[in-house]
Amino acid sequence: MQPYLLLAVGTGGFVGAILRFLISGWVQRLSPTLFPVGTLSVNVLGSFIIGFLALYFESVVAPHQKALVITGMLGALTTFSTFSLETVTMLQGGLWGRVVTNITLNVFLCVVATMLGMMLFKRLYG
């Protein structure tokens, strides 16, 4: 492993983690619900961006750029572990409706957002 790739992932992760903290906190504060919309929002946003950039990085490939943005920043922005913890916490509280909604929305919306990001890239750049 080349040291500059590790530095790129770490730098991207630093930025992505800060963005996740700010965006998810802001969205959650705006929401009048106990449902984890902050986590959902960063997962959907990150999925849209990764869909768009996946096609970009197919043609403009510098390993450190992909490591910085895809692995580092978007890996830290999106958060499967927090989604899992919030889901388990709802399970333990017997909130079955919220559990099903959380799982369904995260999976469905993230897949759709990735597809929309790819579609936008194709529309803009052919």
From Swiss-Prot:
GO biological process: cellular detoxification of fluoride
GO MF annotation list: fluoride channel activity; metal ion binding
Places the protein is found: Cell inner membrane
Record-level GO cellular component terms: plasma membrane
Keywords: Cell inner membrane, Cell membrane, Ion channel, Ion transport, Membrane, Metal-binding, Sodium, Transmembrane, Transmembrane helix, Transport
Pfam assignment, any one: CRCB
Transmembrane is among the record's keywords: yes
Record field: catalytic activity: fluoride(in) = fluoride(out)
Primary localization class, coarse: membrane
Residue stretches spanning the membrane: 3-23, 37-57, 68-88, 101-121
Residues reported in the UniProt entry to bind Na(+): 75, 78
Role summary: Fluoride-specific ion channel. Important for reducing fluoride concentration in the cell, thus reducing its toxicity.
PANTHER family: FLUORIDE EXPORT PROTEIN 1-RELATED
Family: Belongs to the fluoride channel Fluc/FEX (TC 1.A.43) family.
Protein name in the entry: Fluoride-specific ion channel FluC
Naturally occurring in which organism (per UniProt): Sulfurovum sp. (strain NBC37-1)
